[in-house]
Amino acid sequence: MKAIPLSYIARNLWVRRVTTLLTAGGMALVVFVFATVLMMGEGIRATLVATGQPDNVLLLRKGAGAEINSGIERAKAAMVESLDGIATDGEGRRLVSKEPVVLINLPKRSNGKPSNVTVRGTSALGLELRPQVRVIEGRMFRPGTSEIIAGRSVASGFRGAALGETLRFAQRDWVVVGVFDSDKTAFDSEIWGDAEQMMAAFRRPVYSTLVLRLNQREALAGLKAAIEADPRLQLDVKPETQFYAEQSEALATFIRILGLSLSVIFSIGAIVGAMITMFAAVAQRVGEIGTLRALGFRRGAVLVAFLAESLLLSLVGGVVGLAAASGMQAVDIS
């Protein structure tokens, strides 16, 4: 069977370039939305999973699910700190960081609208447990003072959070003495200060979470068994990487479902639009089809030519959509 040349098909698309552009644009929109949503979901998952350290263990009140919902009394924290399997630093101190975690509202620099920001009380041990966190501007806060350090994203995105500025929350003024970078993990969106000062300011008598480092990864099972065997503790014990992976799963799944739903809706519109376009193209080209038949091309060859036009339109739309989606890598979403 004699085939219609591809050059003929390409010229036809160019002659009808307005229709071609609109049809390919609809397909590009579908690909762009679907690819962008997948990128967002994967970005959230990767950011939160990278927040944890493989040797760290995170403890919450049993059933709390999240740090801001948890509460661990000082006595329980002291009991955990005395258990076997916990690593020590060069000075012999046990690597356990006892941290209160709360949410506050701060106005954004861009529009002044309030948004949630996580405030974490910690200490020098907390910084040692998280080697990816580095103070890149200013200095570390001093224990026992109303000094704070802000994550890179908070410092650039919220009013009053830049180096040298003052924030007011929990009925107290806090001076930003440093800005830290956590290598694109969730800590970039937090404010850190002295744990005891945070608890006093927010009037919280309990910690939200305990973060500790194991002296060896195999010690996790023994530590978990010891905590579960003591009915006074009532704590959930999880590897830090597992905790943040679980935290990301719900949001990432929601974004994927939302993106898939939008993509299906847009896909239906794009398919209907492409069908209408191709039917109209066929109806307008009855004479052309007759000429092709008169030149000796069979029905199958004509059908293949029209199908090739549709595939070429889809290919162009897909490439444009992916190219546009790849540009979203340069966009930071808060």
Where are the predicted features?
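Short, membrane-interfacial amphipathic segments enriched in basic
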Residues: 1-7
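Hydrophobic, regular-secondary-structure patches
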Residues: 28, 32-118, 137-139, 144, ...
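Short beta-strand boundary microenvironments
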Residues: 115-157
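Hydrophobic alpha-helical transmembrane segments of multi-pass inner-membrane transport and secretion
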Residues: 17-44, 252-288, 311-320
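Peri-membrane helix termini and adjoining interfacial loops of integral membrane proteins
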Residues: 3, 48-51, 326-334
